[in-house]
Amino acid sequence: TRSHCDWSSDVCSSDLILVVLDKTPFYAESGGQIGDTGTIKGNGVELVVEDVTNNGGTSIHYCKGTINEKAKGKVQCLVDGDRRQNIRKNHTATHLMHQALKLILGDHVHQAGSLVHPDYLRFDLTHFEKLTSDQISEIETMVNREILLNNALDISVKNFDEAKKQGAVAMFGEKYGDEVRVRSEERREGKECRARWAALQ
């Protein structure tokens, strides 16, 4: 993702530069999903973005590199697209795992936390006993089967209460407004029965 933005910065240590943009293509860390990385470049600006966090609605870009004290004007932002795509895959896999856990262990299972990384994911859950090897294998098989089906996702914007009534699952740690983005996928359950899972974003 490429974008041109106005900017301001502050040096908080000898090698770490905090940058605030008027708009940003970088996703900030949220709900267990780590922030984007990439570069910010401009006249007298050469930065590598190592992390992005959200502070009261403002995205803070943690960077290393150089900024000329007299630098001004717009900068060009470039997100590491391959890394973001891997994060997106593991984000979707988190939703698939949540649904598989509910189907195999029961509706009492809730997400208690997560970590979505480009190379792996971690899913924390509530359950009354340790999972058996057979249960873990069954969950893994179900998630991998859904991934291999490669079903298209249906993305829509709905009222929060309506989405919840239709069975959409909220992500742990996320805060939602009156309108939410809902991702859903048709899922096969045996030869005849078909169902849908949906997750709020």
Specify the residue positions occupied by each region the protein language model found.
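Single conserved hydrophobic/aromatic residue that forms the stacking wall/gate
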Residues: T1-W7, V11, E186-Q201
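A glycine- and charged-residue-rich anion-binding loop/surface
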Residues: S8-R188
